[in-house]
A protein has these predicted regions:
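A residue-level marker of the well-folded mature domains of exported/periplasmic proteins
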Residues: 6, 22-309
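Gram-negative bacterial Sec-dependent N-terminal signal peptides
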Residues: 1-23
Length: 309
């Protein structure tokens, strides 16, 4: 065999070997509700690191841009690419039935992450990796109620109304308030998870002359916005208590600086990594310990904030 022939044979062998390796990789389509969300950005980054560390897992991320129909189209496109599994962070938790139906029809395992479908009954081949959002609301409100000595007036910054995370966190807050009849809710308004909206809404309340003892926010970003509005209005730290949820780096820093009174840690890494583990197991037709995997929340206070950094 001449040199050229030997080289061609070697190249072919390498190509076949490379092809075999690629064929062994699991392709997982990841449909995110939106890339432009602080908490979900951290979760997406953790998922990428997890897949890289595992090896043999190829993640294909798509951005739903907070559009239900766009996300459904993206899921269909991922199915058309014959991914081995799907991970979906739904735009609208009430609109997951079509996604579930499409995945089941294609025989592709599906894992919902961070936001669970409104229907708690998951069919075979479908799992969820989320947290108990009612617990988040209970934790932040119980802490605030004690700080307020069981009396005062609160306002609530709501996340997107299309998410059961918003409804459940708020319900958790209201469950606690049943034990504290002297704490009243003055206002509730949708801030759609955004810092700027949290700031604008709080500023409007202050401009209207609303008097409140605490701001209870469904997430850290809106809570930070509220704290900024309070500062601009000349309020001293501690005059109005502010509570968030997520424990993002910005949220942790805000607790450390006293801008936030309290937050609740939602484990982005745990949710992201857990969803990949579940998707890989389902793709390999391995059994999961449970279909609905729950990652616990943890209270973040000025006393323990450094343990979360």
């Amino acid at each position: 065999m001449n040199t050229k022939a030997r080289f061609t044979s070697l190249a072919l062998a390498l190509m076949l070997s490379s092809g075999a390796t690629l064929a062994a990789d699991l392709k997982i389509g990841v449909a995110m509700s939106q890339f432009d969300d602080t908490y979900l950005t951290y979760m997406r980054e953790d998922m990428g690191k997890k897949a890289k560390d595992m090896g043999g897992v190829d993640l294909q991320f798509v951005d739903g841009r907070n559009d239900v129909n766009k996300q459904l189209d993206q899921v269909q496109e991922l199915i058309g690419k014959k991914v081995d599994a799907l991970i979906v962070n739904p735009v609208d938790t009430a609109a997951t039935a079509r996604i579930t139906k499409a995945a089941i029809a294609a025989g592709i395992p599906l894992v919902y992450v961070n936001r669970r479908p409104d229907d708690p009954k998951l069919p075979a081949g479908v799992a969820s990796v989320t947290s108990d959002d009612k617990e988040a609301g209970r934790l932040q409100m119980e802490y605030l109620a004690k700080k307020l000595d069981g009396k005062g007036t609160i306002v609530i910054l709501l996340g997107e109304l299309s998410n059961n995370s918003t409804r459940d966190r708020t319900e958790g807050v209201k469950e606690v308030l049943k034990k504290y009849p002297d704490i009243k809710i003055a206002e509730e308004q949708e801030g759609a998870w955004g810092r700027q909206k949290g700031m604008d809404i709080t500023n409007n309340w202050l401009t209207q002359g609303r008097d409140f003892s605490a701001v209870v926010s469904n997430n850290d970003e809106m809570a930070i916005g509220a704290a900024m509005a309070l500062k601009q209005a000349g309020k001293k730290q501690g005059d109005v208590l502010v509570a968030g949820v997520d424990g993002t780096p910005d949220g942790l820093s805000a607790v450390q600086k006293g801008q936030l009174t309290v937050s609740v840690f939602q484990d982005a890494k745990g949710q992201g990594e857990g969803s990949i583990d579940a998707a890989v197991k389902l793709a390999k037709k391995e059994a999961l310990p449970q279909q609905a995997i729950v990652i616990p929340f943890k209270l973040i206070t000025p006393e323990n904030v450094n343990t979360f950094k």
